[in-house]
Amino acid sequence: ELSKVKEGVFGLASRLYDITFKKNPGIPVYHKDVEAYEVFDKDGTYLAVLYTDFHPRAGKRSGAWMTSYKGQWTDEKSGENSRPHVSIVMNFTKPTQNKPALLTFDEVETFLHEFGHSLHEIFANSTYESLSGTNVYWDFVELPSQFMENFAIEKEFLHTFARHYQTGELIPDELVQRIVDSSNFNVAYACLRQVSFGLLDMAWYTRNTPFEGDVKAYEKKAWDKAQILPVVEETCM
């Protein structure tokens, strides 16, 4: 259940990083489904505003992401530390009159992933906004998010909130283990898929002359080393 997952994730961050989340209905939001939370450090120091935008609606794109509306920076003259405003955006199924918003395991993992990105922004403490939060080298930007993902299969974390929405039964350890055991399914294919993206990027962005050839043939040659399934004709990656 979404509300329980949110409590679990916020509680995890509180235990790991000694921070607290306080809902503030006085902060303006851009849609009635959005909630705003102020984030505070262990000594009560204000850290950030976090917006949660969990449900689909007309005009909202699909997927999940973190957005920084206002980055962190420090005024060199006054020393004032301007704190960030960030949002985590999902497309979880809305609750109905008869059923709360229920999440799949993948959606819980996605929640943790985007929440990890938001923590990267929330903990920023730099002089320049251009170097704070997720404004880092791209090979590092996914580290905080993927670190947080790992807790999705930690029983100690799951036992703080993961209960059946009707019976209250705690998630069985056997089910958690089955999720862990299945985590390597198709992992080699997923790896090759990412390799193919890299091969194609390198093929296009290492060129130093205009391209005037056959795009489909060029792309096919670029990622042919990582291709294991039949090619769908008349398509490009």
Residues covered by each model-derived region:
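Cation-handling catalytic/transport regions enriched in His/Asp/Glu
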Residues: 1-237
